[in-house]
Amino acid sequence: MGICFSAEDQHYQFSQQQNYPKKTTPGKKAAVYLMKSDCEDVVGKVSGSGSGGGGLPLAPKNIKDLQSNPGYENVDIFTYEEMKIATKQFRPDYILGEGGFGVVYKGVIDESVRVGFKSTKVAIKELNPEGFQGDREWLAEVNYLGQLSHPNLVKLIGYCCEDDHRLLVYEYMAMGSLEKHLFRRVGCTLTWTKRMKIALDAAKGLAFLHGAERSIIYRDLKTANILLDEGYNAKLSDFGLAKDGPRGDQTHVSTRVMGTYGYAAPEYVMTGHLTSRSDVYGFGVLLLEMLLGKRAMDKSRACREHNLVEWARPLLNHNKKLLRIIDPRMDGQYGTKALMKVAGLAYQCLSQNPKGRPLMNHVVEVLETLKDDGDAQEEVMTNLHSRGKSVTLYEASSDSQGTRDGNGQRRRRPESGRSKSEAAVDTEKYVSTLSEPDTTKI
């Protein structure tokens, strides 16, 4: 059974949410949530609702506002009793996951919940009043997702804020999180083509946020927050840490450092200066995880490999070294040129200098060039495997296989860590403001 949300990491500080104006594109039809598999020609928009026409941005709502009127188009207010009906009285076997924020249940919204509702599977997140997420993060999700509509953002169906209860109702994502698929020990079904499609979808979601009239910085990009539907279409979820971008002649937003250690951009960790390129760094971490099949932070690995970026980034521009560390579960599924293009993109996104990172629109363009080639390549691979044949679409040097141990098993040769030309950045002393990855995942 897929899930919509996974057990979330702990966040220790909360940033003040401000205005949430978004951009609509005049003269274009909005095709929202009726998504093609390739996400092309689908336009995101701001949900207009009582704002004087034209879908103008709305001021953020507070709890009192939301208790009386949803204020946002296509977002419903549910009573707590209706939430109990939708989850069969919050049955334990309906639990999809739980963490510091509370519990996520699967549910069904239908006629038994409210007359006129067509039966719809949903995921219902109930916040723990004493948990790590508070009203500010809950409000951020409602205020952002209440106004934003895009094929690569998870859809908010409704909410409940009756008395002290805080619940969010989302569309159900049948395949669960990218994290669940990418890091499973056995049976990984994420081919090279699927990974690149997921990366493209996530990039489109970020590009949409950054391209708003007043840009939005997502601030919490990670595999646990990328959800997949039955067609492996990816959507960004969990907007509790989202923040309005700089306005006017501002170059950055100064804010408390929040996020997940291993994903946060170094300049943000050290200074609290937040820009859209902080998200680009997080996207680079995501690409690296998908290329290597390894978590951004993992203290069970060798000491020098604890931080994936510090260990692997210097190797991304070296063909032979990269082939030795690439996820072996993708063996033979990619061409060398495509691999090096994605690795080079990840390398740029992970630049220590924010100005050296590309904009997300450029990232989308680069990943788009891989799509057609990837579709054709997967078809070739499927045909070859159906005939009992195998093929390797890249060349590896003879020494890339490493040596064999006494039992005849291959073992890889150790790699050098950080490039000598790059100065190390000491981020350990800043970790107190970031969350450690939750060891309990769904």
UniProtKB/Swiss-Prot annotation:
It is a lipid-anchor. Belongs to the protein kinase superfamily. Ser/Thr protein kinase family. May be involved in plant defense signaling. It catalyses: L-seryl-[protein] + ATP = O-phospho-L-seryl-[protein] + ADP + H(+); L-threonyl-[protein] + ATP = O-phospho-L-threonyl-[protein] + ADP + H(+). Its EC number is 2.7.11.1. Keywords: ATP-binding, Cell membrane, Kinase, Lipoprotein, Membrane, Myristate, Nucleotide-binding, Palmitate, Phosphoprotein, Plant defense, Serine/threonine-protein kinase, Transferase. GO terms for biological process: defense response. This is Probable serine/threonine-protein kinase PBL17.
